[in-house]
Amino acid sequence: PSTRLSQFSLNGEARDYKGDPFKRLANALRDDFALTGTKVGCDAGDCGACTVLIDGRQACACMVAMAQTDGCEITTVEGLSSAGELNPLQRAFLHHGAAQCGICTPGMLMAATELLNREPEPDRTSVEDALGGVLCRCTGYQTIIDAVMDAHTFTEATPARHHGPSVGSRLERIDGVAKVNGTDQFGADSAPADALWLRLYRSPHARATFQVGDLGEFVAGSDG
């Protein structure tokens, strides 16, 4: 297969990619750069789970070929934290319980980041418009919208809610930090070193008639 060198900034660091120019950015982030915070949902640009920032604008990484990334500045959910400290938006997500199952969370954070870079104190309509390309099945969107609208009131130093036996008190999710910084591991994010992999082969013919010939020679040469 043909290869092409792409050079770009990834979360503030200069990176090189030499490989299939048609490989999707979402897959390259996960496979080649081990950044599994970017999730692949529909793989068709509909759900928005794979949203990243390219030159400051939100984009579905599953729809961007690596050949298009040369010279770009790419930011993923892993690039939001600084020195291990959550940024104000991530802290707002924890406070409002905006990260539930976590699949859409990275995409929501990146879409919201683009908005907040332009409008630090957006109104509800602006937030709804900015998040319109990212689908969520858990939250009903209200907590996410609240978090984005309140993000300007948080800082990196905003203390977390108390963790412990506090009956009647609102607590942050135990796994909340991992969900908002992109380190939470889902089924497709890791595999044992000795895992067996399957490859799906599709017929190049949309409509074809198959004729089964004599299988005797094949059966004779096959064990079992």
Task: Enumerate the language-model features and the residues they cover.
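Flexible, low-hydrophobicity surface segments
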Residues: 152-224
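Signature of N-terminal electron-transfer/Fe-S-associated modules in redox systems
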Residues: 1-162, 168
